[in-house]
Design a protein with these regions (language model features):
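Short alpha-helical "recognition helix" segments of helix-turn-helix
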Residues: 109-114
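DNA major-groove recognition helix of helix-turn-helix
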Residues: 125, 132
């Protein structure tokens, strides 16, 4: 597996977190719609087909199910990453990879936390990628 393929595999966790965030924002939008409907209950006829409370509840339930599935998937990915990082058998490389791919820190932040220069962090990252064994199940 090339280093690019390894990076793609490693970034899956961040992608999963972004996906969860997107679903949570959508859920908030539906909650806002539900609040507006419950605030404006009226006998007056309206034009067009309005969303019913039942429709909104169904949609929100579907979104919550998606969020639960995505959270479960992200936890599985995180565990895969942690196992792969432990396989590096080097605490410094393991820490660097966790900061980068689990904590999603940028290079400047990693350099500060680890007490190294950014170029040295890049060098360690390259070494970690070379040593990293990815178990694609």
């Amino acid at each position: 597996m090339t280093n690019k393929e390894k990076k793609d595999w490693l970034w899956r966790y961040k992608e999963a977190l972004l996906d969860i965030d997107s679903w949570q924002r959508e859920l908030e939008e539906w909650q806002t719609r539900a609040e507006k409907i419950t605030q404006v209950v009226s006998d007056m006829p309206r034009g067009g087909k309005a969303l019913e409370v039942d429709d909104i509840v169904i949609k929100m339930t579907e979104i919550m199910d998606n969020i639960k599935a995505k959270v479960s998937e992200s936890q599985k990915i995180k565990l895969e990453l942690e196992i792969a990082f432990e396989g590096l058998n080097d605490g410094i490389l393991e820490g660097l990879m966790k900061y980068r791919y689990i904590n999603c820190l940028d290079w400047a932040q990693i350099a500060i936390v680890m007490g190294y220069s950014e170029p040295h962090c890049w060098k360690l990252h390259g070494k970690a990628l070379e040593k990293l064994e990815v178990d694609r199940q």
